[in-house]
Amino acid sequence: MEAEGLGWLLVPLHQLVSWVAAGAMVFGGVVPYIPQYRDIRRTQNADGFSTHVCLVLLVANILRILFWFGRHFESPLLWQSIVMILTMLLMLKLCTEVRVANELNIKRRSFAATDSKDEELRVPPRRPYLDFDPHHFWHWSSFSDYVQCVLAFTGVAGYITYLSIDSALFVETLGFLAVLTEAMLGVPQLYRNYCHRSTEGMSLKMVLMWTSGDTFKTAYFLLNGAPLQFSVCGLLQVMVDLVILGQAYAFAHHPQKPAAHAVHPASTKAL
């Protein structure tokens, strides 16, 4: 009798746990970027954050949404992609504003045009939409250029997906590319740390959140029977996170000696 009396609690409790897990999947991925965003705004310095992290996440989540049209997966994963895209656009907007404000003699770099002379001297000439300098790709001076690039990529990828949606091979390949790209999330930051032989400007708190979040996400994929691509993605991300944590430990105990003439920028701990 007592077991039967408690039975009515079990189903609601199970549903509650499912809702909490789904909510954590949707919004948990953006939590690590909150300290990064706040620190960049506080210090007005974005040097410690690689905007290529935003590029990786934008591409990965756009591809994941397109993959959903060919092979439906759980709704929380779809909403997670939408929330992440909006978050990365906010990060790009802040980083662009801060970088431009900190550059005294800035040359305009845009998605639709190559470098021009200083804007104070003359207005840059109109150029074809895709006539951009590859050396300055993803280092533009206007947030609108990033938006144009994202929209162009979404349009092209969406059109190709529309034409090939009936091909199972294409759909599975699309899913693999989405998760493989996302698995490379930490690589731009890892490479930046390696080149500078330092993790200054990178928030250890954020990387720890990355690691815990990716571990939870991978477990969620495995327990809920998500497509194999998602589980592979999660495992690769956890490994990259651990390497970045190793960098933080190594560079903290064996810091690079600064050059005599070097001037360190203000710290921007926030990845």
From Swiss-Prot:
Residues bearing Phosphoserine are: 110
Q: Which domain of life is it from?
A: Eukaryota
Any stretches that span the bilayer, and where are they? 7-27, 49-69, 72-92, 145-165, 168-188, 232-252
Subcellular localization is given as: Membrane
Q: Which UniProt keywords apply?
A: Membrane, Phosphoprotein, Repeat, Transmembrane, Transmembrane helix
Pfam family, any one: PQ-loop
Alphabetized InterPro entries for the sequence:
PQ-loop_rpt, SLC66/Scramblase_ANY1
Record bears the keyword GTP-binding: no
Membrane topology per record: Multi-pass membrane protein
Keyword hit for Repeat: yes
User: Which residues belong to any copy of the PQ-loop domain?
Assistant: 14-80, 178-233
One GO term describing the cellular component: membrane
What is the protein name stated in its UniProt record?
Solute carrier family 66 member 2
Organism of derivation: Mus musculus (Mouse)
